[in-house]
Design a protein with these regions (language model features):
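Hydrophobic cores of alpha-helical transmembrane segments in multi-pass integral membrane proteins
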Residues: 28-57, 67-99, 106-132, 145-146
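Non-cytosolic membrane-interface motifs at loop->transmembrane helix junctions
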Residues: 136-146
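Extramembrane terminal tails and long inter-domain/linker segments of multi-pass membrane proteins
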Residues: 1-26, 57-62
């Protein structure tokens, strides 16, 4: 293609905003709902960890609820659960609106969101079971991060 043909190429027609919103409504709502659920879970686990810090004898017989595991779970739920889902949902909606075209295959986005949430859930179960590496800030078990 010559340079003249490239400049005269027809531009794809922009879709109506309602059509764009309808195409990405399902994945965006799922991502935002998942983010809200993870935010509530991170808050609950964080409060339980704070309680363990101030009252060490609380649930002392349960080895799965030590302060280190609860704190790591709270951060994973917040960073990867809440912030990851909310960021992906916002990015998906903004990119669809800014490019002026509806989302082509929303089923793939939903499948990716399900896999993302399954990975975060596997990471939280692994941390609770004690499968976390010793690196602060990266508490994800190997099977949940690869």
């Amino acid at each position: 293609m010559s340079e003249e043909e490239t400049h005269n190429a027809p531009i794809a027609p922009e879709a109506q905003p309602e059509e764009i919103n309808a195409s990405c409504r399902g994945p965006v709502l799922f991502l935002f709902f998942s983010a809200a659920v993870w935010a509530v879970q991170a808050t609950g686990v964080g409060l339980l960890g704070s309680l363990k810090m101030h009252v060490p004898g609380f649930l002392a017989d349960c080895p799965f609820l030590t302060y280190g595991r609860l704190q790591a779970n709270a951060w994973v739920a917040f960073l990867y659960g809440f912030a990851g889902n909310a960021g992906l949902g916002l990015t998906l909606w903004m990119l669809s609106r800014l490019r002026g075209m509806p989302l082509a295959k929303p089923g793939f986005v939903l499948a990716g969101a399900f896999l993302w949430n399954a990975g975060v859930t596997a990471a939280m179960v692994g941390i609770t079971m004690g499968d976390q590496p010793g690196m602060a800030g990266y508490e994800l078990p190997a099977y949940a991060s690869r």
